[in-house]
């Protein structure tokens, strides 16, 4: 039943495909190839104008995996250093080095990905305004056409909270963000989307910056809430949007992988809700 419902729900052509995060590139090249082959076989991507993969941690990226992404049509990836300060990377448990980040960016740009994003986080443990400035200034030399500047969000159950790691003050986070704005503008970047999360340091925000023409459509679709988003996988949240009637509904997949696998009836129910919603839109 789930497969039949899936086929009924994915007849519409996809405008933007996004596979994220987490870090999909923890999969092997063979696993990634099998997964993207299934995506291309089951979805109509003939009108797809954006194919984005979260490459995530630089220590999960190699030439073979990136070639698989290119072979399947990926035109946008994200490499997420978060920081280039060794003591910050150590404090947050990251295994990669600043040199790994530079090598990953060199590889991605040399292989010809049209768009590459880098994620940075202001307010990480052990960071300082000076360290954040060094990180941003260096990242601006790597050739990314998108840079997303996040503010640390202290999520419940996070290692930072559980271990009581000291974090920069709100004043220091403000100094980091105050530096980012003119530094990015000077290099031709402009902000194009903004959002807030709960428990953010200093009650600041996350801002996506890009070079003109390099905007990420999926990011815009999420922020505008004018487009339906069909989500697949454990923890996924499907958003159904009927802009004409000013109506939005959401359905959620089971969060944990084992629960997701053991509850196919929930997946069938969610897909039926998606199908019924779009039938009503067409009336």
Mark where each language-model region is.
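Radical SAM enzyme core and accessory elements
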Residues: 1, 208-283
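Single conserved hydrophobic/aromatic residue that forms the stacking wall/gate
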Residues: 2-10
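Canonical radical SAM enzyme core domain
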Residues: 3-4, 24-68, 81-84, 96-100, ...
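Glycine-rich beta-strand-to-loop/alpha-helix junction loops that act as flexible
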Residues: 17-24, 150
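Conserved C-terminal portion of the radical SAM core fold
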Residues: 72-78, 83, 99-163, 170-198, ...
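Bacterial c-di-GMP phosphodiesterase catalytic domain signature
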Residues: 83-94, 144
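Short glycine-enriched, charge-decorated loop/helix-capping segments at active-site entrances
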Residues: 90-96, 163-167
């Amino acid at each position: 039943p789930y497969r039949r419902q899936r086929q009924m729900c994915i007849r519409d052509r996809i405008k933007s495909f996004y596979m994220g995060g987490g870090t999909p590139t923890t999969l092997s090249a063979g696993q990634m190839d099998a997964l993207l082959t299934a995506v291309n076989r089951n979805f109509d991507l003939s009108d797809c104008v954006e194919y984005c993969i979260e490459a995530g941690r630089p220590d999960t990226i190699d030439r073979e995996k990136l070639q698989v992404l290119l072979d399947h049509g990926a035109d946008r990836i994200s490499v997420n250093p978060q920081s280039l300060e060794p003591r910050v990377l150590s404090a947050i448990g990251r295994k990669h080095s600043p040199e790994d980040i530079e090598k990953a960016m060199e590889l991605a740009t040399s292989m010809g990905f049209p768009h590459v994003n880098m994620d940075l986080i202001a307010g990480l443990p052990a960071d300082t305004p000076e360290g954040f400035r060094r990180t941003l200034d260096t990242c601006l030399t790597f050739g990314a056409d998108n840079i997303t500047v996040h503010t640390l969000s202290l999520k419940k159950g996070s290692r930072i909270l559980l271990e009581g790691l000291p974090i920069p003050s709100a004043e220091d986070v403000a100094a980091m963000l105050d530096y980012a704005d003119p530094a990015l503008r000077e290099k031709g970047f402009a902000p194009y989307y903004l959002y807030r999360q709960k428990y953010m340091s200093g009650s600041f925000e996350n801002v996506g910056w890009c070079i003109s023409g390099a905007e990420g459509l999926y990011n815009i679709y999420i922020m505008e809430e004018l487009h339906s988003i069909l989500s697949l996988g454990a923890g996924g949240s499907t958003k159904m949007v009927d802009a004409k009637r000013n109506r939005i509904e959401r359905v959620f997949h089971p969060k944990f992988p084992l629960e997701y696998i053991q509850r196919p009836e929930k997946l069938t129910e969610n897909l039926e809700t998606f199908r019924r919603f779009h039938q009503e839109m067409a009336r």
